């Protein structure tokens, strides 16, 4: 039996208001997607019934849609998933409640679910409403600490098929004291390694410095750990690619997010790049420290 050919590559873009959904939609349009924003859910099946337009489609869906509700959206996802003509991906553009509230207060906009109440009430209401949809997402991007430029770059790695033919990898370091980043596929705890913080000459430096990396590498446990880590990730990447994933996110944590996690993320990122994989590196706590000294107008969020 010949299986039907998939005629539509369809990306449903949703997420809480203020998280960056509009930025995501615009970025996908720049990549060549046919973009339709705020299309009523009941119209989506009719769109698929029509002739193929020859390029991927991105649909923006949020609580402002005329007939939006989470149950109807999940039913639509199930229906499209079962349609052999459709290659469906669900992109959920997420953000922490505290950051969403900050953005609303900064712009003085009213929340669509709480026009006569505080933004905090609308944000919490919308997060609860979208919770069942969030767990169905194929791709989750947390924009809490992203600028619009960061979001566009992340989307390019995931959805711009012309930009790369291999699975893209992002590695990031973080501090456990500030919480585990959301949207990370695999997390590795680096707190068992020797801590350069206790060496006065290294304390003010970070894991990108050769002297810090050398100190961490001198830990007898480092070499076998890193060899196993590199081999594991290099083993998993082709398997993830075969499963249709376009992106894999790896997180490395330590106490302060300055030395050990940064060094390991840097070293693994370099090793994967040498093996031919597209890699992006991010150091959350170092970015926070750098952002603290920038003028306020440079801190625009997605």
Swiss-Prot record:
Domain of life: Bacteria
Positions with a binding annotation for ATP: 15-22
Binding site for GTP: 62-65
Keywords, ordered alphabetically: ATP-binding, GTP-binding, Nucleotide-binding
The keyword S-adenosyl-L-methionine appears for this protein: no
A Gene Ontology molecular function term of the record: GTP binding
UniProt keyword annotation of Lipid metabolism present: no
Similarity comment: Belongs to the RapZ-like family.
Function: Displays ATPase and GTPase activities.
PANTHER family: RNASE ADAPTER PROTEIN RAPZ
NCBIfam families linked to this entry: PRK05416.1
Protein name: Nucleotide-binding protein RHOS4_02640
Protein species of origin: Cereibacter sphaeroides (strain ATCC 17023 / DSM 158 / JCM 6121 / CCUG 31486 / LMG 2827 / NBRC 12203 / NCIMB 8253 / ATH 2.4.1.)
């Amino acid at each position: 039996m010949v299986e039907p050919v998939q005629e539509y590559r369809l990306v449903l873009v949703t997420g809480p208001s203020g998280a960056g959904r509009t930025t995501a939609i615009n970025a996908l349009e720049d990549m060549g997607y046919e973009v339709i924003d705020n299309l009523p859910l009941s119209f989506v099946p009719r769109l698929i019934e029509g002739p193929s337009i020859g390029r991927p489609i991105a649909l923006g869906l949020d609580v402002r849609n005329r007939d939006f509700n989470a149950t109807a959206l999940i039913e639509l996802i199930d229906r499209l998933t079962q349609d052999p003509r459709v290659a469906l991906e669900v992109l959920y553009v997420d953000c922490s409640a505290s950051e969403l509230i900050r953005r609303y207060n900064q712009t003085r906009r009213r929340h669509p679910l709480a026009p006569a109440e505080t933004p905090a009430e609308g944000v919490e209401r919308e997060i609860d409403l979208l919770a069942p949809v969030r767990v169905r997402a194929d791709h989750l991007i947390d924009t809490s600490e992203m600028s619009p430029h960061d979001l566009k770059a992340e989307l390019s790695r995931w959805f711009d098929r012309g930009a790369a033919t291999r699975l893209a990898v992002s590695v990031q370091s973080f501090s456990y004291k500030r919480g585990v980043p959301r949207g990370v596929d695999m997390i590795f705890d680096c707190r068992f390694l020797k801590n350069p913080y206790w060496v006065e000459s290294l304390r003010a430096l970070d894991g990108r410095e050769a002297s810090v990396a050398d100190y961490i590498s001198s830990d007898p446990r480092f070499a076998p750990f890193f060899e196993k880590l590199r081999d594991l990730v290099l083993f998993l990447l082709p398997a993830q690619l075969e499963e249709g994933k376009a992106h894999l996110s790896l997180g490395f944590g330590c106490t302060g997010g300055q030395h050990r996690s940064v060094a390991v993320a840097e070293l693994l990122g370099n090793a994967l790049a040498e093996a031919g994989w597209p890699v992006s590196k991010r150091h959350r706590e170092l970015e926070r420290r750098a952002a603290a000294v920038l003028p306020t107008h440079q801190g625009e969020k997605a």
